[in-house]
Amino acid sequence: MAKHPVPKKKTSKSKRDMRRSHHALVAPNLTECPQCHSKKLQHHICPSCGYYNGRQVLAV
């Protein structure tokens, strides 16, 4: 049977945590829709009213 490669040295908690430092989740940046005042993603059509950039783009 073939042997699988294994780490030669134990990874310290510091090295492990430094590697994981970029793994945090980022909360979506929600803004208020100027038309209906519901929460929406920036640079996206409002899912409640269908407005984007001051004009209706989607019939809701």
From Swiss-Prot:
UniProt-listed InterPro entries: Ribosomal_bL32 (IPR002677), Ribosomal_bL32_bact (IPR044957), Ribosomal_zn-bd (IPR011332)
Molecular function as annotated in GO: structural constituent of ribosome
GO annotation (BP), single: translation
Region (Disordered): 1-26
HAMAP family: Ribosomal_bL32
Residue ranges, compositional bias (Basic residues): 1-23
UniProt name for this protein: Large ribosomal subunit protein bL32
Keyword annotations of the record: Ribonucleoprotein, Ribosomal protein
Superkingdom of origin: Bacteria
Protein family according to the UniProt entry: Belongs to the bacterial ribosomal protein bL32 family.
Any Pfam family matching the protein: Ribosomal_L32p
GO cellular component, one term: large ribosomal subunit
